[in-house]
A protein has these predicted regions:
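Residue-level recognition of single "structural anchor" positions
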Residues: 1-198
Length: 198
């Protein structure tokens, strides 16, 4: 009798369950708000803890200094033209595929251009680099039966993507929320930096 692999039979998060939790823009914005300010809104410069209702652009006007704050400002989602639900779906697809997902496949699944999918993937991989920063490999690293045509400047991102999923393989359901949390704590990464050395 063969022994079952605990990783192979680990319950992940199903697509319907994911869409129930993160299927609308409002749900995604609320998650980003909760991740960014877990103890409630607080403006760092003036210390105010109160804000007015968001305007049509989802900006939160501070009651004290009247500065408008976006929940996505200072995060990986900053100044994005894509809806947050597209970002969250990319996080789901990237985290739930055992061997990762190509930018071309991501582009087809999300309905975005290949360049947009590449940038989205590399931004999320940078968040994975940040999430794995304390677990960096050093010295010579050997992998069996793997050949990838990866540019050296992106190697750390691809390796971090693999390690991020591997180190969290026993909690596939929590992997999505963990990556969302990591993305809200990762600084913005414009294209010019995403295309440079990782």
């Amino acid at each position: 009798m063969t022994k079952k692999s605990t990783v192979q039979f680990e319950a992940g998060i199903s697509l319907p369950t994911f869409l129930d939790r993160f299927g609308t823009e409002a749900q995604c914005r609320e998650v980003v708000f909760q991740q960014r300010w877990p103890h409630g809104f607080q403006r760092t410069s003036c210390g105010s803890r109160s804000h007015c209702r968001p305007d049509t652009r989802d900006l939160l006007p501070c009651n004290r200094c009247k500065h408008q704050v976006s929940p996505t400002a200072g995060t990986l989602f900053a100044q994005t033209k894509l809806p947050l639900k597209t970002w969250f779906l990319a996080i789901y697809l990237l985290s739930q595929h055992k061997n990762g997902i190509w930018a071309m496949t991501l582009s087809r699944r999300l309905g975005v251009s290949c360049n947009t999918a590449w940038l989205l993937k590399h931004k999320l991989m940078q968040a994975m680099v940040e999430g794995e920063h304390d677990r960096m490999l050093h010295g010579v690293v050997q992998m069996d039966d793997a050949y990838h045509a990866i540019k050296g400047k992106y190697l750390q991102r691809y390796l971090s993507e693999f390690c991020y999923r591997f180190n969290r393989r026993f909690d596939l359901a929590g992997l999505v929320t963990q990556l969302i949390l990591t993305a809200t704590r990762t600084q913005p990464l414009p294209y010019r930096l995403a295309a440079l050395d990782a």
